Amino acid sequence: MSEPLQELGNYIATKRADCVLAWDVTNKELNLDVTPSNIVGLVEFLKTDATCRFSTLIDITAVDYTGRAKRYDVVYHLLSMYQNHRVRLRVSIREDQMMPSVISVHPSANWFEREVFDMFGILFSGHPDLRRILTDYGFRGHPLRKDFPTTGYTEVRYDEAQKRVVYEPVSLVQEYRQFDFMSPWEGAEYILPGDEKKE
């Protein structure tokens, strides 16, 4: 299975050398590291080229690497139902950088890009309706960023007295604690009766 993917990787890297920075095959999937400026052209090429025929955009997501200058990897998953191949496109961008929208090539990218914006705060230029899709209207922050607090900023509850939903700052019943989840049986060296004589 990896030999056809190797050939496909070579083919794409040769045809689109303007945007493919590197590629490899991992877990029977082709991974391409690409430049953000040419992502729309590459996705269109992968969809329309007779050799590739990646007609289905499965998902768009992102990964937050807080320690890097290019903080985010925006990841596109494409499927060729004709060739039974998958490709993963990785685009590394800075926190203040915008990604071009691929809605013109894959209309299904509309909600995927809105989800990435909502969860990570990554903006997509050319998107017709870039607003939150999973969090509430007045939600503050982007929950899948590594710097977002695990408790959040506000809690939402229904107030019986006011007969409406209210937003309040998070108030923890107890101080935030770090729990040690290490099993007491892992890593311990127990000396059983009779074993002390062996030493």
Swiss-Prot record:
It comes from the Bacteria. It is a peripheral membrane protein. The keyword Cell membrane applies. The keyword NAD applies. Its EC number is 7.1.1.-. It is found in: Cell inner membrane. NDH-1 is composed of 14 different subunits. Subunits NuoB, C, D, E, F, and G constitute the peripheral sector of the complex. This is NADH-quinone oxidoreductase subunit C. It comes from Roseobacter denitrificans (strain ATCC 33942 / OCh 114). The lineage of its organism: Bacteria, Pseudomonadati, Pseudomonadota, Alphaproteobacteria, Rhodobacterales.
